[in-house]
């Protein structure tokens, strides 16, 4: 269900015209601190000094502030535990919205059934290391690597991921926070290690992903009507409420 598989498919298909094996950078962001969200603990650090009951009070206060008001999001996120805050980055629906769409869901089905055991292994680590840990064992393992492997193999292309070599993995696990994010720069240690090898314009270029403009496509009547007809004409009644 990752939209990035669309451009990845075409990149893999084109690459296969020229080579049989490719090297890819999967894992570098999770291991070396490449995601922008890993900078968040710095901005929220002052909240860590506030007693728990008062922090929860700030969260309740933020709920009554008008939507869009400056500082509302900061107060809310600062009042939350890392586990709840970081999971929220991946949430597309509130439980109420999800239940309206899929009435068979229940509050007992919680993301913590999956994440609690992973977070438990990172108790006592710094916040960024904990965020990286959850990403490695959910997002990286369950999405990124699966997607890359299946799409490249669908094009008879072999994918190698050198950043996930055991020696590299073990070295990255020993890095302190200030060698992951330094001077506002992500993946600082990795960039330093490669600066005599990789050209400057590549080393510090703007981060590029594989974005797919699905929202833009579906905003147009042709694609919207097509997608809606697929849903309404499908046998999906057992999965979700089509009227929602």
Task: Name every feature range the model reports, one short phrase each.
Residues 1-9, 51-58, 233-237:
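Short, basic, helix/turn surface patches
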Residues 6, 26-27, 185:
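Short beta->alpha linker loops
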Residues 17, 21-23, 69, 73-244:
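Adenosyl-5′-phosphate
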Residues 19-35:
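Short acidic/histidine-rich active-site segments
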Residues 1-9, 37-49, 174-181:
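ATP-dependent adenylate-handling ligase core
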Residues 33-38, 217:
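Short aromatic-enriched loop/helix-cap "lid" or pocket-rim segments at secondary-structure transitions
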Residues 40-72:
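Conserved phosphoryl-transfer catalytic core
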């Amino acid at each position: 269900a990752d939209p990035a598989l669309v451009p990845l498919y075409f990149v893999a298909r084109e690459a296969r015209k020229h080579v049989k094996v490719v090297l890819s950078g999967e894992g570098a962001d999770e291991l070396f601190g490449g995601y922008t969200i890993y900078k968040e603990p710095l901005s929220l650090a002052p909240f860590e000094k506030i007693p728990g009951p008062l922090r929860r009070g700030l969260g309740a206060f933020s709920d009554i502030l008008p939507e869009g008001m400056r500082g509302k999001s900061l107060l809310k996120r600062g009042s939350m535990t890392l586990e709840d805050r970081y999971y929220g980055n991946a949430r597309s629906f509130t439980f109420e919205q999800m239940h309206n769409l899929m009435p068979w869901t229940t509050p007992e089905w919680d993301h913590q059934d999956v994440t609690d055991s992973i977070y438990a292994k990172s108790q006592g680590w710094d916040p960024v290391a904990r965020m990286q840990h959850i990403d490695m064992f959910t997002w990286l393992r369950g999405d990124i690597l699966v997607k890359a492997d299946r799409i490249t193999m669908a094009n008879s292309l072999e994918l190698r991921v050198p950043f996930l070599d055991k020696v590299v993995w073990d070295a990255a696990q020993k890095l302190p926070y200030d060698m992951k994010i330094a001077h506002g720069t992500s993946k600082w240690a990795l960039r330093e290690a490669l600066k005599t090898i990789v050209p400057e314009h590549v080393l510090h270029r703007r981060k590029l992903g594989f974005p797919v403009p699905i929202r833009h496509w579906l905003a147009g009547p042709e694609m919207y009507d097509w997608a809606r007809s697929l849903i309404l004409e499908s046998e999906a009644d057992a999965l979700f409420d089509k009227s929602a």
